[in-house]
C-alpha cells in the first residue's frame, strides 16, 4: 500500500505539491467547492490554519466539482475566489475528482484508510475532512456537517504528540 508521503498532487499552477514536505506535520485535507452551502467553512478553515500553522498544522484543499457542479472550472478562478472572499492562505491544489474511475489517487488512499459513517468509503459531498497525523497516518474522517472549529480537540491532541507517539 502506498504511504501518504509518496503522493505529489498538482497545485493550481500545474506544479507538483510533494506530500513528502508535510512530514512531521498534522495535515487536514478537505475537498472544497466555491458555490456550496458549506463554502462558508473556508472562514473557519482559515482560522484554524492561522491559529495552528506555527505549531505544525497544514491544511490542503482539493477543489472538486463532482457534487452539484459547484466549483469554478479553472484553478485560477477558484484561488482568486477563495483569497478575495475568505482570505484563504493555505494551499488550494488543482481541481480533482474524489470518486469514481477518474478519482484522484490521494482520495483513493484517504478513503481506503478511513471509511465514513456506516463504513461507506465514497465521498458524499463537498467539505469532507481527513485528519492525518505527524507520521502520515490518516486518523479520522469528518463529514461536511462537522464544522472546522469542531476539529480543534483532535488537532491539538495530535499537535501535542511527537511523531513517534502518534495514535
Swiss-Prot record:
Its main location: other. The keyword Oxidoreductase applies. Keywords: Antioxidant, Disulfide bond, Membrane, Mitochondrion, Mitochondrion outer membrane, Oxidoreductase, Peroxidase, Peroxisome, Redox-active center. Disruption phenotype: Impairs growth and peroxisome formation in oleic acid medium. It is a peripheral membrane protein. Induction: By glucose starvation. GO terms for cellular component: cytosol; mitochondrial outer membrane; peroxisomal matrix. InterPro entries: Glutathione_peroxidase, GPX_AS, GPX_CS, Thioredoxin-like_sf. It catalyses: 2 glutathione + H2O2 = glutathione disulfide + 2 H2O; a hydroperoxide + [thioredoxin]-dithiol = an alcohol + [thioredoxin]-disulfide + H2O. SUPFAM superfamilies: Thioredoxin-like (SSF52833). It is found in: Peroxisome matrix; Mitochondrion outer membrane. The active site is at 36 (cysteine sulfenic acid (-soh) intermediate). Belongs to the glutathione peroxidase family. Glutathione peroxidase-like protein that protects cells from phospholipid hydroperoxides and nonphospholipid peroxides during oxidative stress. Has peroxidase activity using thioredoxin or glutathione as a reducing power. Involved in peroxisome formation. The active site is a conserved redox-active cysteine residue, the peroxidatic cysteine (C(P)), which makes the nucleophilic attack on the peroxide substrate. The peroxide oxidizes the C(P)-SH to cysteine sulfenic acid (C(P)-SOH), which then reacts with another cysteine residue, the resolving cysteine (C(R)), to form a disulfide bridge. The disulfide is subsequently reduced by an appropriate electron donor to complete the catalytic cycle. In this atypical 2-Cys peroxiredoxin, C(R) is present in the same subunit to form an intramolecular disulfide. This is Glutathione peroxidase-like peroxiredoxin 1. The lineage of its organism: Eukaryota, Fungi, Dikarya, Ascomycota, Saccharomycotina.
